């Protein structure tokens, strides 16, 4: 099975207008990504406010994204849920629509044991036939995979990658030393992506690449072509943006940035609220300093 989880993957925002999906804005956003030659996109993940969508909105968003992309790059659906049966349903609907893979985090709030986490993913794996990227994001879920659970899950044939949004930079080394099959490790934090790659990572699932996909793609390419100095130069240039995108809960700052660039409204779903004036000013100054052209 081809491993689609590598390189620069953009975690796409979900644009709204008048509390409905703005599908015209979605097309502009996706074409911007495709033109920058990103390796794949994630739809309805954390950055895409997936947990704030109704099931009907989720289906419409995925179907529209799949139609717009039209097989030019892989489309990965966020299928995370606290309820295993619901996660299976999200994966089943995604499969019908024709996505290329899933990104799934452990259930949040419930705080399952490692045994429960394993059985959750095993059930989704057995109910589907598409590749899965595990998503470690303990700051949101309240639980994380142990190395042992990652190793055990990697033995399931279609679990092919881990997106790691934690801060344990030794983990890629530890995981690579015990997993024999091709199992890709991707960073879930833009600011740590080069350090993560240096420890065995093969890419980044990025928030910043919503705003500047060409620079983020160039950074990953330079690194993997052994141009460490060039990659580091881009990374240093983008560091203020990385930091600004998390001064408030993601995706509040990136949603404002995309509005400022003209892609969509600044509308965000409760319980999230729009960026403060201080954050807006910071985002505007950084975008201006980067001379981003869309």
From Swiss-Prot:
Gene Ontology molecular-function annotations: (R,S)-4-hydroxy-2-oxoglutarate aldolase activity; 4-hydroxy-tetrahydrodipicolinate synthase activity
Keywords recorded for this protein, A-Z: Amino-acid biosynthesis, Cytoplasm, Diaminopimelate biosynthesis, Lyase, Lysine biosynthesis, Schiff base
Assigned EC number: 4.3.3.7
Localization per record: Cytoplasm
Pathway terms, separated by semicolons: Amino-acid biosynthesis; L-lysine biosynthesis via DAP pathway; (S)-tetrahydrodipicolinate from L-aspartate: step 3/4
InterPro entries: Aldolase_TIM, DapA, DapA-like, Schiff_base-form_aldolases_AS, Schiff_base-form_aldolases_CS
Binding positions (pyruvate): 47, 205
One GO biological process term: glyoxylate catabolic process
Coiled coil (UniProt feature): none
Reaction equations catalysed: L-aspartate 4-semialdehyde + pyruvate = (2S,4S)-4-hydroxy-2,3,4,5-tetrahydrodipicolinate + H2O + H(+)
Site (Part of a proton relay during catalysis): 46, 109
PROSITE patterns according to UniProt: DHDPS_1, DHDPS_2
Keyword Signal included in the entry's annotation: no
Keyword Amino-acid biosynthesis: yes
GO cellular component terms, semicolon-separated: cytoplasm
Catalytic residues in the record: 135 (proton donor/acceptor), 163 (schiff-base intermediate with substrate)
Subunit record text: Homotetramer; dimer of dimers.
PANTHER family cross-referenced by the UniProt entry: 4-HYDROXY-2-OXOGLUTARATE ALDOLASE, MITOCHONDRIAL, DIHYDRODIPICOLINATE SYNTHASE
Protein family membership: Belongs to the DapA family.
Function comment: Catalyzes the condensation of (S)-aspartate-beta-semialdehyde [(S)-ASA] and pyruvate to 4-hydroxy-tetrahydrodipicolinate (HTPA).
Official protein name in the record: 4-hydroxy-tetrahydrodipicolinate synthase
UniProt organism field: Rickettsia bellii (strain RML369-C)
């Amino acid at each position: 099975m081809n491993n689609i989880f590598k390189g620069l993957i953009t975690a796409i925002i979900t644009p709204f207008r008048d509390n409905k999906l703005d599908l015209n804005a979605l097309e502009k956003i996706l074409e911007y990504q495709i033109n920058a030659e990103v390796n794949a996109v994630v739809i309805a993940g954390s950055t895409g406010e997936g947990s704030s969508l109704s099931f009907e909105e989720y289906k419409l968003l995925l179907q529209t994204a799949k139609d717009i992309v039209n097989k030019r790059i892989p489309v990965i659906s966020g299928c995370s849920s606290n309820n295993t049966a619901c996660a299976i349903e999200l994966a089943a609907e995604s499969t019908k629509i024709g996505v290329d893979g899933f990104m799934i985090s452990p259930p949040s709030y419930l705080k399952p044991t490692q045994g429960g986490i394993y059985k959750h993913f095993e059930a989704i794996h057995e109910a589907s036939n598409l590749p899965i990227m595990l998503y470690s994001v303990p700051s949101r879920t309240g639980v994380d995979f142990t190395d042992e659970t990652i190793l055990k899950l990697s033995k399931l044939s279609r679990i092919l990658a881990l997106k790691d949004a934690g801060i344990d930079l030794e983990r890629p080394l530890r995981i690579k030393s015990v997993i024999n099959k091709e199992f890709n490790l991707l960073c879930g934090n833009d600011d740590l992506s080069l350090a993560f790659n240096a420890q065995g990572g093969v890419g980044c699932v990025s928030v910043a690449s919503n705003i500047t996909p060409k620079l983020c793609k160039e950074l990953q390419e330079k690194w993997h072509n052994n141009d460490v100095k060039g990659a580091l130069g881009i990374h240093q240039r983008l560091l203020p943006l990385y930091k600004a995108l998390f001064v408030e809960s993601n995706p509040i700052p990136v949603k404002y940035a995309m509005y400022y660039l003209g892609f969509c409204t600044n509308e965000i779903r409760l319980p999230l609220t729009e960026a403060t004036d201080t954050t807006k000013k910071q985002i505007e100054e950084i975008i201006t300093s980067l001379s981003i052209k869309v």
